A protein has these predicted regions:
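Terminal (and in a subset, N-terminal) low-complexity or junction segments at the ends
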Residues: 1-165, 171-267, 273-697
Length: 697
């Protein structure tokens, strides 16, 4: 063994150390012994073991550096993930780059990404012929172009190489998969790997499985799984995790569970796959159970796990578990990572804890458009559209440029506030930014104008759209329905079908609601029956609720009840629609039956008790009304007060039941009393029905 080889082992160990002290001591020993200047091999190890700043200082002191020393300096920067600094070293290296130099620099270009620098390096590789002869350079070129979203460059680099090996072929498959070109990835794998007799590696198969998952290609995914079993690749945990993710992605939860239970080794990725898969399949209880088992097994969650569990808590909703997960995110140091923080803000918003959401949002050092959109949407969901608009204004002045998805959230907030002038301003902004050309933005605009009472503008936006998808058609149908123009809504539905646009679940909600508001019973029945028979759309609770409302308004209570009893999955909202119809048609006997069913489904909803109380009051059943009020008091239930708003001279005036905060309340009250006297005087055609006026208990 040469005299410097033990020193090499020590330097390699120092490179793996978290502090530069050991490397500095060895450096001093090499200087004293004279080994440093006599062996570039040892010098390269010193460079690799030092922090990048010290390594650069040492490199600059070398009179005539070699490619090996230059590569050691580059490797130190790449290991530290200092991609930009690695590229800035190019003019300071003072050597002609070899194949290894180009591979390191191309990796830095891929990770930034820096396509222009990558192309310049490609030209250098062509001049030195390494692009055609060195497999590592060719693979680095393919990887760089793929990361820079330039698969044409990857294809050219691959085709230029004389004899591509398995590494280069794997780079192509991975590049296609990472660029969401799953079909091309599977085709390349079939033609250039399997078709030419190459044995795919586990790395190749991970990309193939991921491509099959993107396409939800059950046949190819299962074929890969069988190949893994036949070739004893089940030892590769990364590969098995990819198969697990594939089964979850295609909705084969039972197959994923069987694979999971048969795994002898499980890491954090394995558990995260299960949690994420359960969330995506809507099985929130299983997701939270899997997470708890993971913690019990001593597996430390990572950022991906935290995001999935937080999403589960959002959907549950379970604020207490969400807070516990937040604490774990703080402990493992990922709380303020963009994806984690955004998921936490969304969870707090969906659990009606908007103050906690804003505290976390304000602590985020970086906020992308998704984070801002979550806050804007969250305030709207919590009934605070004015706060949504305030946040949007802050985004315009100090945040990232809003994307189209963010603007849809802003339009939804504006539609809740109902300020027409604001709607016009937002429409103008969308025209300037060019977002109006996107169909889903046009659909949100139609919905905005409809809810603000300007059906004419909604129609003009709809008619000006160059393309119309099912969402845009549904928004316009809903707009007609909101304005009581049910016949026009039905006619538009027929035009949509004639235009070869297949209606979806949302479309039927819109058209059935329109029929309900306009009393179009027969049309509503016909459309409801056509859902399954003609269009293959299975009615859900919302459709049944719309039909119950339609039949109830028409007085067909028995048929509405029959429809509900035939649907075993009817929710509380659907039964509430029938109870409201019973109240409107004074059917007390059916009201009590429906109320019993309703309160069994949701015993803590104050609004249902309020509705039942109005029925008892109308029948002058004071004992039942009193008993009903006692239940509300004993359970501590509070009904959210009704709120009305009117825009006057660009100012929104809000009136809440039971409150008198308006500065002109006395004038308004005096005018209302005059209207009441006029109505009761008999000089007008309208006669007030005192039975429908009750004091809110």
């Amino acid at each position: 063994m040469r005299g410097w080889q033990p020193l090499q082992k020590l330097l390699e160990a120092a490179a793996d150390s978290s502090t530069p002290v050991a490397a500095a001591r060895l450096h001093a020993h090499l200087l004293r012994s004279g080994h440093l200047h006599s062996s570039h091999h040892l010098t390269s190890h010193v460079l690799a073991s030092y922090p990048t700043g010290l390594a650069r200082h040492l490199f600059d002191e070398i009179p005539v550096p070699t490619p090996r020393l230059a590569n050691a300096l580059l490797r130190a920067h790449v290991r530290a993930r200092q991609w930009c600094d690695a590229l800035l070293l190019i003019p300071c290296l003072r050597v002609r780059p070899d194949a290894f130099t180009l591979s390191l620099l191309l990796k830095a270009c891929a990770m930034l990404p820096a396509l222009a620098h990558g192309r310049a390096l490609h030209a250098l590789a062509i001049r030195s012929c390494t692009a055609y002869t060195d497999a590592f350079v060719a693979a680095a070129l393919v990887h760089m172009y793929a990361k820079c979203r330039g698969m044409v460059g990857s294809i050219n680099a691959y085709n230029a190489f004389s004899e591509p090996d398995m590494v280069l072929r794997t780079s192509m498959v991975t590049g296609y998969e990472q660029n969401r070109m799953a079909a091309e990835a599977l085709e390349f794998f079939s033609r250039h790997v399997v078709g030419q007799g190459f044995m795919p590696s586990p790395v190749t198969l991970v990309s193939v499985i991921s491509a099959a998952a993107q396409l939800k290609d059950v046949l190819n995914g299962q074929a890969c799984h069988a190949f893994v079993i036949r070739n004893n690749f089940e030892y590769d945990l990364v590969l098995v995790n990819a198969i697990l993710g594939f089964y979850m992605r295609i909705g084969a939860v039972q197959a994923a569970r069987r694979l999971f239970e048969g795994m002898t080794e499980k890491d954090v990725v394995t558990w995260s796959c299960m949690v994420t898969g359960y969330v995506q399949s809507g099985d929130i209880c299983e997701a939270l159970t899997a997470y708890k088992k993971m913690v019990e097994a001593g597996i430390k969650p990572n950022a991906v796990t935290v995001v999935s569990v937080v999403q589960a808590c959002s959907l549950a909703p379970d604020i207490e578990e969400g807070r516990r997960v937040h604490d774990i995110a703080v402990k493992i140091g990922c709380e303020l990572e963009m994806t984690v923080a955004t998921a936490l803000v969304d969870m707090y918003m969906k659990c009606s804890c908007h103050e906690e959401a804003m505290q976390l949002f304000c602590r985020m050092s970086k906020k992308d458009a998704v984070a801002w959109a979550v806050v804007i949407s969250g305030f709207t969901q919590n009934g605070l559209p004015d706060e949504s608009m305030r946040v949007f204004k802050c985004m315009l002045f100090g945040g990232p440029f809003p994307d189209a998805v963010t603007m849809v959230k802003v339009l939804a907030a504006c539609s809740e506030s109902g300020v027409m002038r604001q709607a016009f301003c937002l429409h103008g902004y969308l025209v300037i930014t060019g977002f109006c050309d996107k169909i889903f933005v046009a659909a949100a605009l139609v919905d905005l104008y409809s809810k603000c009472g300007n059906l004419g503008c909604a129609v003009r936006v709809f008619e000006s759209a160059m393309e119309k998808d099912v969402v845009l058609w549904s928004s316009m149908i809903s707009g007609y329905g909101v304005h009581g123009l049910g016949q026009q809504a039905v006619e538009l539905f027929q035009m949509m079908v004639a235009s070869s646009v297949k209606p979806n679940s949302l479309t039927f909600v819109s058209v059935l609601s329109a029929c309900s508001h306009s009393g179009l019973v027969q049309e509503g029945k016909r459309i409801f029956e056509s859902m399954t028979q003609v269009y293959g759309v299975v009615p859900n609770a919302v459709h049944h609720s719309a039909m119950v409302d339609l039949l109830g308004r028409a007085g067909e209570l028995q048929e509405a009840a029959k429809l509900l009893h035939g649907n075993g999955r009817a929710d509380a909202h659907t039964w509430c629609a029938l109870l409201a119809a019973c109240r409107a048609h004074h059917d007390t006997e059916m009201s009590e039956v429906v109320a019993a069913k309703l309160l069994k489904l949701d015993p803590d909803h104050a609004g249902y008790y309020n509705l039942l109380n109005n029925i008892y009051t109308f029948d002058e059943n004071w004992s039942s009304a009193k008993e009903n009020r006692n239940i509300i008091r004993d359970r501590g239930l509070n009904k959210v007060p009704g709120c009305s708003a009117v825009e006057l001279n660009n100012v929104m005036h809000t009136f809440t039941a039971g409150e008198r905060p308006h500065k002109d309340w006395e004038k308004i009250s005096r005018l209302l009393r005059e209207f009441s006297r006029t109505l009761k005087g008999g000089d007008c055609f309208f006669q007030l029905d005192n039975h429908l006026v009750f004091e809110d208990f």
